[in-house]
Each structure stands twice: as C-alpha cells, then as structure tokens.
Amino acid sequence: MDEMILLRRVLLAGFICALLVPSGLSCGPGRGIGTRKRFKKLTPLAYKQFTPNVPEKTLGASGRYEGKITRNSERFKELTPNYNPDIIFKDEENTGADRLMTQRCKDKLNALAISVMNQWPGVKLRVTEGWDEDGHHFEESLHYEGRAVDITTSDRDRSKYGMLARLAAEAGFDWVYFESKAHIHCSVKAENSVAAKSGGCFPGSATVALEQGVRIPVKDLRPGDRVLAADGLGKLVYSDFLLFMDKEETVRKVFYVIETSRERVRLTAAHLLFVGQAHPGNDSGGDFRSVFGSAGFRSMFASSVRAGHRVLTVDREGRGLREATVERVYLEEATGAYAPVTAHGTVVIDRVLASCYAVIEEHSWAHWAFAPLRVGLGILSFFSPQDYSSHSPPAPSQSEGVHWYSEILYRIGTWVLQEDTIHPLGMAAKSS
C-alpha cells in the first residue's frame, strides 16, 4: 500500500513537470515521427460518393439496423433533443422529431455546426431530416433510430455540399453520403455498438517477440518481459514491458487489419501505427533513419491507413526494419483487447512496428505524457525489484479495464486539446 501511495505521488509530481515540457519535442523513432502535423487540405466529396467506402450498415461504417424507435417504445429514452442555436431544423412536421437523435449523433452534429460556421462565416448548418416516426424512409433506415440526419447549409448553396460532406466526415460521422444534389446524408453507430468506442488495443492473440527468442501472445506478457521494439534512432531493441494501459480478456472488438504481402497486424481504430505515404516501386529494406528522413513516416490512426501507404516491418533476418506497402485494409472481429506499454513507447506486434499509444495522433505528445508513469514505475521497481523482474502473474493493480493513469490523461486531453487531434472512437467504454 505504501509503495502505491509513493508511486501516485511521484506520478503526480512528474505529470506536472511533463505539462511544462514543450509538446513539440520529438522522441518518436526516427526524424519523421513526432513532428507536428501540417494543416490538412480538405477535399470535397463528389456527387454520389460516400465515406468510408463501404455500405452504410456494415461494421466499417454505422453498423447494422437495430429496430425502429417509436414514442411508445422502451428505446425512445435513447433519443435526446438538440436545441443548438447554431443549427437550423426544418421540422416540416411541426412535431420536433427532427431535433431528436442519439447522443452520438448529437455530438457529431454539434461539432459539424462549428466547422460550418468556421468554413463559411454567416452560414449555419441546416437539418432537413432527423428522426423519422412517420415511415417516410426506406425499410431499415437509420432515420428510424435517430442515428441519421440529412443536412444542407442554411443558404442552400449546392456548390457547398461537397465540402459540407467532407466536413461531416471530419466531424466524426461514421458514414457520410453525397446522396442527393439537395442534401447530404450522415449516420452514426449505435450507442451500444461493439465498434462505437474502440479505445486503442491489439487482440489477445497478437504476438510479440521476447528477448529469449520466443514469440508469445500479447495477453501473456508479464512485467519484467523484454519485448522487441524500436528506439529513437529506429534501431530494433528489446524494451521493458511496463503494464497494460487497457486489458479486457473476453470482450469482442472490431479491429482494423493492415495487411502487406508478408505481414498483417490487427489494431483498433484509434491506435497509432507508423505510416508513410504511398511510394510506388519501393518495397525494399534500407536504413531506417534514411527512410524516415526522406519518406516522411509519421504516426497515424489505424482507421486512416489505406492501401498504398507504407508501414515498417521486421526484415527476414530479424535485424532491422524494412518498409512494406499496405495491400489491403479491412475489418475483423476478435476476442480480447490489450494495450501494452513499453519503456520505449513502441512495440513490434505481429512483426509490424506500432506505437504503444492511441487516441491522440501525435506519438511524441503521448510519449511525453507517459513519462511520469515510466519514472514512477522505475522508482517503484527500485524499492520492489521482485515486482518487475520476475515472470509471476501481474499484480492486483493490473486488473481488467482501462488503467487509471490513461483515464486521467484522456480527460485532461479532452479539456486542453483541439477536438480534431483526438480520435472520435478514443476511450473504450468500461467493461461491465
């Protein structure tokens, strides 16, 4: 008990110090990682284009239809009215139905309203259709669940609708469709969806390489294990496994599968992977540092990775990293969710280099934020070396769920960081 009190005091002091460190400093692997991301130029959606490029009611988008909600149904309490003064609701039925929606839909719509006013001063977001209680849409429409809205701009300038669709996607809607020249259709996942909040994890069956030369499932890691990772210069090293920032043994989650010609890695939408832009014809090895310096690898959410991007994999000899082109990205359900943290902040998982961090797209920021935890665990190991040098089962503090330190960082991050730096599927819902 005394040791845990000491650890928490050290972490608190260290965290305050970490807040004073300039966030722009880079400590990611290689020169290209950890640099501040340039402003992203937004491209309007074309007419009839939808994003992501999968059907609306699939896991990769808004998910399956769960049944119509009526005013008399038990699920009616899932809907909440939206009285945002920056949004115009057409409400042609004069019932207020268009204002009713799920909380997730409301959050994304409110975020979009801000983006619209920033993009076009004097223009507001306009909702033409929200929750439908009258049966005006096709069968199994997500409008019947309050999970979909049809939108325009208040000036009804159709030349803006392509950019409006892009802004909706950036605001976090799970599926956006330039459905009609008269409106944009947007929808979200169900509140209880397995993919609604994914956190940042790997499945329990994902493997890591230990210093002893064996590979084990990530779920079997113990404090004291040294796992294959990469240091700040891009060299492969064996790094101390510290703990799991999230650990759920039986939960089923949706994972993005990033597949190259030889390797495949599974990770949740909000987890960070080191990615380079498409570079045709270069799927060979080479010096890791020169790769970063010339090709611009950076941390990226798994949900943003596309075919043609490049990732870093362990070469055949197991001595270094090579770049490999992503051939396919798809979704897969798997059991277990584990977020291991190493001393270096990186981990080679299924022979692909990944960050240990998630939710915030800047690896270097996350690594600095976790510095107090690394220092605190180091001090604790000095007083109790047996806790961190044996292969005994994890201590009671390593129970299931999200680690308290990670929860604190997430809450602080939502207060001090801009919304577009935090993944909309960031913190996993707590296990029940």
From Swiss-Prot:
User: What PROSITE patterns does this protein map onto?
Assistant: INTEIN_N_TER
Keywords (alphabetical) are: Autocatalytic cleavage, Calcium, Cell membrane, Developmental protein, Endoplasmic reticulum, Golgi apparatus, Hydrolase, Lipoprotein, Membrane, Metal-binding, Palmitate, Protease, Signal, Transferase, Zinc
Question: Where is a lipid covalently linked (N-palmitoyl cysteine)?
Answer: C27
- Tell me the first and last residues of the signal peptide: 1-26
Name the residues that bind Ca(2+) 2.
E93, E129, D132, D134
Q: Which residues bind Zn(2+)?
A: H143, D150, H185
Q: Where is this site: Cleavage?
A: G200, C201
Q: Where is this site: Involved in cholesterol transfer?
A: D246
Enumerate the catalysed reactions.
glycyl-L-cysteinyl-[protein] + cholesterol + H(+) = [protein]-C-terminal glycyl cholesterol ester + N-terminal L-cysteinyl-[protein]
Q: Does the keyword Repressor apply?
A: no
Locate the site labelled Essential for auto-cleavage: H271
Q: Note the superkingdom of the native organism.
A: Eukaryota
Under Gene3D superfamilies, the record lists: 3.30.1380.10, Hedgehog/Intein (Hint) domain
Motif range (Cardin-Weintraub)? 35-41
User: Which CDD domains does UniProt cross-reference here?
Assistant: Hint
Top EC class of this enzyme? hydrolase
Task: Return the annotated site residues (Involved in auto-cleavage).
Answer: T268
Molecular function in Gene Ontology: calcium ion binding; cholesterol-protein transferase activity; patched binding; peptidase activity
A GO BP term here is: cell development
Q: Which cysteines are joined by disulfide bonds?
A: none
* Chain residues carrying a lipid of type Cholesterol glycine ester: G200
Q: Assembly and interactions?
A: Interacts with HHATL/GUP1 which negatively regulates HHAT-mediated palmitoylation of the SHH N-terminus. Interacts with BOC and CDON. Interacts with HHIP. Interacts with DISP1 via its cholesterol anchor. Interacts with SCUBE2.
Name of the protein this chain belongs to: Sonic hedgehog protein
For this protein's source organism, the top of the classification is: Eukaryota, Metazoa, Chordata, Craniata, Vertebrata
